[in-house]
């Protein structure tokens, strides 16, 4: 039977004097007396009587033996108590760490910190995403699914089950296919609406066909008879033509337009080619400056010739040296 630590301290087993009383080196009759065991004899007197018998040579050996004996007694007392204590129980002195290992006694909060570290490591590791195997549809299955989608975008459960049996697919796969197909259909509808809005916007008006110009509107407003009839020879019809150059006010009244703006030639040029056939041959020769065959029909050719002569004389006068 092992005694508790207070009883051991009382009878002096942990003290140097108690060990000296039990050491085999001393006298058994004097050291193991009843008074020494019960503690009636003072330790100082026992130590004094024993130290007088011990030689100085054996003093170091006695100290070493006493230290070893004390450690051996302490281990013998602690280990049997750990065997009898269960988890969560305490001994008679309320020490909750005697039934635990040395690492738990030294650092009771170490286990909780280790568990917290494990939890934090598990949280830091990214969770693996569950990947579902993608279903590969055959051409026949896609054809039947598209036909069913054209009939109804939201088929009921019975229709989906019949279609699933027809195409040899699970009903869940058919339902997911219809969901994805409806999403695709909504995206297409939105794209069509946005494209129509962009076409109607004024920003893209420059891409359209150009508007008819004012000149074409003016020409279209003129009657065709005025272009085809020979009344174009008068001045009012010539002035109504687009691009007609009138006589500047600074020129004298005797000025006449050049012969290539002859009303007869203009009328011939404005007639359609289908009615007129090939254009008339060019009348002017090589010496167009000196010979003006078209002016012979014009009664005002004398005034034009006089003006040209004056222009030539002026050019010759400028070119002469002083």
From Swiss-Prot:
GO MF terms held by the record: DNA-binding transcription factor activity, RNA polymerase II-specific; RNA polymerase II cis-regulatory region sequence-specific DNA binding
Spans annotated as Disordered: 75-136
Motif interval(s): OAR: 302-315
One GO BP annotation of this record: positive regulation of transcription by RNA polymerase II
Pfam families linked to this entry: Homeodomain, OAR
Composition bias type Polar residues, residue spans: 100-117
Key words of the record: Developmental protein, DNA-binding, Homeobox, Nucleus, Transcription, Transcription regulation
Location of the motif Nuclear localization signal: 308-312
Keyword Nucleus (UniProt): yes
Basic and acidic residues bias (residue ranges): 75-87
Source taxon at top rank: Eukaryota
Main location (coarse class): nucleus
Entry-linked SMART domains: HOX
CDD domains: homeodomain
Annotated region of DNA binding: 130-189
Recorded coiled-coil stretches: none
The protein's role, per its UniProt record: Plays a critical role in eye formation by regulating the initial specification of retinal cells and/or their subsequent proliferation.
Family, as annotated: Belongs to the paired homeobox family. Bicoid subfamily.
Protein name: Retinal homeobox protein Rx-A
Upper lineage: Eukaryota, Metazoa, Chordata, Craniata, Vertebrata
């Amino acid at each position: 039977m092992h005694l508790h630590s207070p009883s051991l301290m009382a009878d002096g087993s942990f003290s140097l004097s108690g060990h000296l009383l039990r050491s085999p080196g001393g006298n058994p009759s004097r050291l193991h007396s009843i008074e020494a065991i019960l503690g009636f004899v003072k330790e100082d007197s026992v130590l004094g009587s024993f130290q007088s018998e011990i030689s100085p040579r054996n003093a170091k050996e006695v100290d070493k033996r006493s230290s070893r004996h004390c450690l051996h007694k302490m281990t013998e007392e602690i280990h049997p108590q750990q065997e009898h204590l269960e988890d969560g129980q305490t001994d008679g002195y309320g020490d909750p760490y005697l039934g635990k290992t040395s690492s738990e006694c030294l650092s009771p909060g170490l286990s909780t910190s280790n568990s917290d570290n494990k939890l934090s490591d598990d949280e830091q590791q990214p969770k693996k995403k569950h990947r579902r195997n993608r279903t590969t549809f055959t051409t026949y299955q896609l054809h039947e699914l598209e036909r069913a989608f054209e009939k109804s975008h939201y088929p009921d459960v019975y229709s989906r089950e019949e279609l699933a049996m027809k195409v040899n697919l699970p009903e869940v796969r058919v339902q997911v296919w219809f969901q994805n197909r409806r999403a695709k259909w909504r995206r297409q509808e939105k794209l069509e609406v946005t494209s129509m809005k962009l076409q109607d916007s004024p920003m893209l008006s420059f891409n359209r066909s150009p508007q008819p110009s004012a000149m074409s509107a003016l020409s279209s407003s003129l009657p065709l008879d005025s272009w085809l009839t020979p009344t174009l020879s008068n001045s009012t019809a010539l002035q109504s033509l687009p691009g007609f150059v009138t006589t500047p006010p600074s020129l004298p009244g005797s000025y006449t337009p050049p012969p290539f703006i002859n009303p007869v030639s203009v009328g011939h040029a404005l007639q359609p080619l289908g009615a007129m056939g090939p254009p008339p041959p060019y009348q002017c020769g090589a010496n167009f400056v000196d010979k003006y065959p078209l002016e012979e029909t014009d009664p005002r050719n004398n005034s034009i010739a006089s003006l040209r002569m004056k222009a030539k004389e002026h050019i010759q006068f400028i070119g002469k040296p002083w």
